[in-house]
């Protein structure tokens, strides 16, 4: 079924909704994909931009129709029309702003109220920034809800493809699916300290073996 502003294409396509607090970098993230930015359409009835993001896999081309809120979330929650027919989702927070992580459960609840049993990726953005407020080991929500989590840096393109690859594998039911070529991305605006980030990733792995805190606030003590 073609959704508004979604032309029928002869390869698999999926509605991807991106949610999270304002200022977490959702729009910056989506705009990295240059062809999607060039071909985006505005959906005035809901007030979103729909970006068609194409990826090329070993099983052929797939498209994510990526719905971007255009900042409405700053005025409260999003209308159900944003979520309806969503087939996969990304919840984004900013690792330099603790409140954006504390609001992740609310976004998850709103999403799951309308879209049941869809694959969801949690993304901690802005890992290129030095003064992290949310450390890798403090990110536990994905473990409680069985979500995938990736640390990303939209402005440096770090881990850009990983959320899409995870979702593509889940939607295709094929854990061996892989991308055979990279999409054209905007050039990096910042550089990321890969050595420092490798330590964060190690911390993340080590945290998987730790018991979950009863309350997320405990993780910040």
Curated annotation (Swiss-Prot):
This is GTP-binding nuclear protein Ran2. It is found in: Nucleus. GO terms for cellular component: cytoplasm; nucleus. Residues 71-87 are annotated as: Switch-II. GO terms for molecular function: GTP binding; GTPase activity. PANTHER family: GTP-BINDING NUCLEAR PROTEIN RAN-4 (PTHR24071:SF26), RAN GTPASE (PTHR24071). It comes from the Eukaryota. It holds the Pfam family Ras. GTP binds at residues 21-28, 71, 125-128, 153-155. Its main location: nucleus. GTP-binding protein involved in nucleocytoplasmic transport. Required for the import of protein into the nucleus and also for RNA export. Involved in chromatin condensation and control of cell cycle. It comes from Solanum lycopersicum. NCBIfam families: small_GTP. Keywords: GTP-binding, Nucleotide-binding, Nucleus, Protein transport, Transport. Residues 10-174 form the Small GTPase Ran-type domain. The keyword Calcium does not apply. GO terms for biological process: protein import into nucleus; ribosomal subunit export from nucleus. Found in a nuclear export complex with RanGTP, exportin and pre-miRNA. Belongs to the small GTPase superfamily. Ran family. The gene is RAN2. Residues 40-48 are annotated as: Switch-I.
